[in-house]
Each structure stands twice: as structure tokens, then as C-alpha cells.
Amino acid sequence: MYKRQVIGNGVVIDPAHLVSEIVLLRGQGAEITPQTLVVSDTAALILPLHQAVDAAREALRGAGKIGTTGRGIGPAYEDKVARRAIRLGDLASESTLDAKLQALTAHHNVWLKASGEPEADPAVLKDGLMALRDDVLPFAGQSWRVLEEARANSRRVLFEGAQGVMLDIDHGTYPFVTSSNTVAGQAATGAGTGPTNIGFVLGITKAYTCLLYTSPSPRD
């Protein structure tokens, strides 16, 4: 059976967690190689900076906190939309990485300083990324091309999304939602394929709504 895993461009990725999961799976006997796993080179990265911003914002919200996971997902998506994100492919060029980290930290440090939080050091962030570079860059590739090749060869492709509809940034219980689209339509844009290439959608209905950790339920 032809098996290849693809992490699409619509995902924000914590490279440290990615490496640790690869090590874990290999330890359990799974074959994880650049031939079996492709990670979109345009996927935005989650940095320790994003986790610090996430935690600080939640603390400032007090009783009105959203209930985020604290993993930096929201701030990472913000940077992606604002066109200042560090993307996986950026790790291939130190000069590109340096310039983008300077711009990224300059933006966030204004808020961190005003909030009384420690400022982010671009050199420290770079050191962390460079330590992971050789472990993650071999998996970087064009996810859309992998999917197009699979389609052209009549292979079956299973798209898997995370979280429920009610956590969708547009269609969920806003503002107590995640920072991306979680509905079936996101599979096309988040993976890099045309919407007409998705032939079947399977939805799971539950008797309760998916919520963030401390989010109020609709009845509240």
C-alpha cells in the first residue's frame, strides 16, 4: 500500500514538537523519512516567542480569558496573516532568517515591553531554530505537488483536520474559537489542492460542542 504523510501549508508547526514526535514514533518502530513525510515549506512556525505572548495575553484577560492552550497557536496565525511569519523554508537561508527574526521581534517586543514582560531576543530564537534545522529541513517540500502527483496517479488521499466546527474562526462560538478554519472546506486551501479534488466529506456529530478549556458553553 502506498503511504505518505503530508503536513500542509495551512498548519502552524512547532518545530521542536515536530522533532520530538518524530523521535517518539521512530522509537515505536514507525518509519519516518523524507520519503514518508512531507511538511509544506510554506507552513508557518510556532516559536517560543508566540508561546510567551499567548500566556501573557491570557493572564492579562483575567476573568475574560479565552482559554487558549498556551501553545502559541493564535499568535503564530496572527503573524502568518500579517505577513511576518517565519516559515519552514526560511530555515534554509540564514540571511533571510536573520532579517525576518529582527522584524518579528521588533513587532512583538513593543507589546511585551509595555506589558512588563521580558523582550524576545532574535539571537536566542535563531539559535533554537538553527539547532533544529538539520532535523526538520529534510522533510520540507511542496505539499501541493505531492497531492497533485497523487491525484494524477489516481491514488486515494485522506484529509484529516483537527477540532470541531464550533471552534472554526468564522463559524464557531466566536471569540471562544481557535485561530483558523476547521470546517471541511479548509482541507483544500490548507493542503494545497483544488476544492473539486475532494470527493467525499465525512463529518462526526456529537451531542455536545467542542470548546476551548475555559470557554463558556452556548447555554451560558
Language-model regions: role of each:
Residues 11-13, 23, 44-45, 162-165, ...:
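Short, glycine-/Ser/Thr-/acidic-enriched flexible segments
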Residues 67-82, 156-191:
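Conserved phosphate/anionic-ligand binding catalytic regions in large, soluble enzymes, centered on
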Residues 18, 22-146, 157:
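Internal alpha/beta core interface subdomains
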Residues 3-16, 55-57, 176:
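Glycine-rich phosphate/pyrophosphate-binding loop regions near the starts of catalytic domains
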Residues 173, 177-215:
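A conserved active-site cap/scaffold subdomain adjacent to cofactor or substrate pockets
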Residues 4-6, 35-38, 75, 155-158, ...:
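Structural motif
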Residues 15-26, 102, 144, 148, ...:
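Predominant activation on well-ordered alpha-helical scaffold segments within soluble catalytic domains
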